[in-house]
């Protein structure tokens, strides 16, 4: 091999530096009609380096120095690279590693230029050359990089298990090396660097740890695709931790990934972890700076794009906070409700104390492994966490309200219809959950009225042709809201009245809410009909239960309408019977539907037997009075 200080070797190093510059810097400025111009030039230089290395090798063989790196591997060589073999720091091992490195860079080059088969061939050549060496500080970085690249390549072909194999081998190489050696390993670029330009130990460590961070990131994606969500979350969390520790991250991208990870924890009821991820996301997103003013954004296309990206990603983080608040309230409700779904205040105090003790113990055991941040950011994250409410902790709505405002500001109705409606539905769900904790029935009713005010205008304005499913959701929710308000008003009236007779104002309000609920349930049912208004003979699975429940609710609502006119009362009872009969007859014609509405079917069957008697008595009374 040529001396590291010889002119020949300096020429090789210069070519490598030029190839790196073409790949990493010059390629960014390639014209649209020649998108790979710089990378093709880099490929030519890498090919020349490969030829030079082979010529050095031949020269050494002719002079009798060293075993050629193309000989078969020594017996006993392990598949993962550990075991007996040519040492990584031997001349033959170094030659093989240098040739393998060029194969690696050629492989990446071909993949980048969309020549995947050629790229795979070069990367596998790299793997085969490294099989002739035991893993050492001089080649462990290359061992990991090439398997990372093969993992990415096979994942792109949807060969997830093949990808998994390469990435898990990279992981085991790292862990074994750190256990057996742990010294800062040689970076691949140093194979082609003159002695005076070698990296410091600190920079070597940073690059090596970053390569392993990439391994963990890719494994997180692999496990997610394999449906191993718990392992995927663990690897994702570790990746985010390492990115912060190495100071190698884009603030907004990191923040969005942390916020997304919080959603996994929330669905598992791990609110401490979810809260920590969201607090970290909020703090780190602040490192991206403020969005440019609207005036500045209008003057510069780059500033306009940056403003849009910052606003969008912060709005998406806000939506993740919204989900935290909603899920927290809903899970708290499950813990605190009594047998009829009302707040059990005695149990609330008992469970608050028990849960706080439990949370303290859990946090002591789990939090040390979870923490994000450096000295600069940790205090800010911890401070924000303390301001956010937790399971059974007194409710603080400032974070949640701010999140709704931020999300609505970006996801406006004009241009983001689906997102805007989903945020409104979440806002409605927030008030529904809060109403559970409100003991004042009048205030609880006002909370439900806020939900109506949010949803009703949008529901009526949405185009039924393009947003049919969304309108159905909103119509059903509005029907349920009015139904809840009706029950609350009746309970209030009964509490306040001196006798069992309701005054005219209360009756009018009750009937208005009852009719509004029936109207929206009927709108939902009408949306299932054909354009000619024909009721479907067979209900699709996704609307089967909602449709039958809507029928049952409409029947119940018509029977509850208060009327002083016997003829109007008779008309309402006839309509009620008609809807009860539909539920019973549909389930008789489609036995498989009965399991989806067991309670409603049982009550409908009972009412189909009782209502005709009530109708006949009313008719008889009307006949006598006439």
Where do the PLM segments sit?
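Extended alpha-helical scaffold/coiled-coil
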Residues: 1-626
């Amino acid at each position: 091999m040529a001396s590291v200080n010889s002119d020949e070797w300096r020429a090789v190093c210069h070519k490598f530096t030029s190839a790196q510059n073409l790949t990493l810097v010059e390629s960014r400025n390639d014209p649209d009609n020649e998108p790979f111009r710089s990378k093709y030039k880099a490929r030519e230089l890498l090919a020349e380096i490969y030829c030079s290395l082979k010529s050095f090798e031949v020269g050494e063989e002719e002079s009798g120095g060293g075993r050629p790196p193309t000989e078969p591997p020594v017996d006993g060589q392990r598949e993962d690279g550990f075991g007996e073999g040519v040492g990584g720091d031997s001349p033959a091992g170094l030659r093989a590693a240098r040739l393998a490195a060029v194969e690696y860079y050629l492989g990446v080059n071909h993949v980048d230029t969309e020549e995947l088969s050629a790229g795979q061939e070069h990367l596998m050549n790299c793997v085969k050359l490294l099989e002739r060496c035991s893993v050492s500080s001089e080649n462990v970085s290359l061992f990991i990089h090439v398997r990372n690249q093969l993992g990415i390549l096979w994942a792109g072909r949807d060969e997830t298990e093949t990808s998994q194999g390469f990435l898990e081998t990279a992981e085991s190489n790292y862990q074994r090396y750190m256990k057996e050696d742990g010294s800062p390993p040689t970076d691949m670029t140093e194979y082609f660097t003159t002695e005076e330009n070698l990296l410091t130990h600190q920079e070597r460590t940073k690059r090596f740890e970053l390569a392993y961070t990439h391994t963990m990131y890719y494994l997180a994606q692999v496990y997610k695709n394999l449906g191993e969500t718990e392992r995927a979350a663990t690897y994702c969390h570790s990746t985010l931790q390492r990115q912060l520790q190495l100071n190698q991250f884009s603030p907004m991208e990191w923040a969005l990934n942390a916020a997304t990870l919080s959603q996994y924890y929330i669905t598992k009821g791990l609110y401490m972890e979810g809260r920590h991820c969201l607090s970290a996301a909020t703090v780190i997103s602040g490192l991206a700076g403020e969005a440019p003013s609207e005036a500045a954004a209008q003057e510069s296309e780059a500033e306009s794009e940056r403003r849009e990206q910052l606003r969008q990603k912060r709005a998406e983080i806000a939506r993740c906070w919204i989900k935290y608040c909603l899920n927290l309230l809903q899970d708290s409700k499950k813990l605190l409700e009594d047998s009829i779904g009302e707040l059990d205040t005695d149990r609330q105090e008992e469970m608050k104390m028990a849960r706080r003790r439990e949370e303290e113990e859990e946090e002591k055991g789990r939090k040390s492994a979870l923490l994000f941040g450096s000295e600069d950011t940790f205090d800010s994250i911890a401070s924000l966490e303390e301001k956010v409410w937790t399971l059974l902790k007194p409710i603080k709505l400032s974070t949640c309200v701010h999140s709704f405002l931020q999300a609505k500001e970006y996801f406006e109705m004009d241009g983001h219809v689906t997102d805007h409606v989903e945020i409104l539905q979440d806002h409605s769900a927030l008030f529904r959950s809060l109403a559970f904790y409100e003991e004042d029935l009048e205030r609880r009713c006002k909370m439900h009225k806020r939900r109506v005010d949010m949803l009703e205008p949008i529901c009526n304005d949405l185009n039924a042709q393009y947003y049919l499913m969304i309108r159905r959701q909103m119509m059903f929710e509005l029907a349920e809201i009015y139904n809840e308000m009706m029950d609350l008003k009746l309970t209030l009236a009964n509490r306040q009245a001196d006798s069992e007779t309701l005054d005219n104002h209360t009756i009018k309000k009750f009937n208005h809410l009852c009719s509004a609920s029936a109207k929206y349930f009927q709108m939902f049912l009408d949306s299932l009909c054909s354009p000619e208004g024909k009721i479907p003979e067979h209900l699709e699975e996704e609307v089967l239960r909602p449709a039958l429940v809507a029928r049952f609710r409409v029947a119940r609502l018509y029977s509850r309408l208060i009327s002083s006119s016997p003829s109007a009362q008779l008309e309402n009872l006839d309509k009620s019977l008609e809807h009860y009969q539909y539920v019973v007859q549909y389930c008789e014609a489609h036995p498989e539907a009965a399991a989806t509405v067991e309670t409603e079917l049982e009550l409908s069957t009972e009412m189909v037997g009782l209502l005709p008697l009530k109708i006949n008595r009313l008719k008889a009374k009307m006949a006598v009075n006439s």
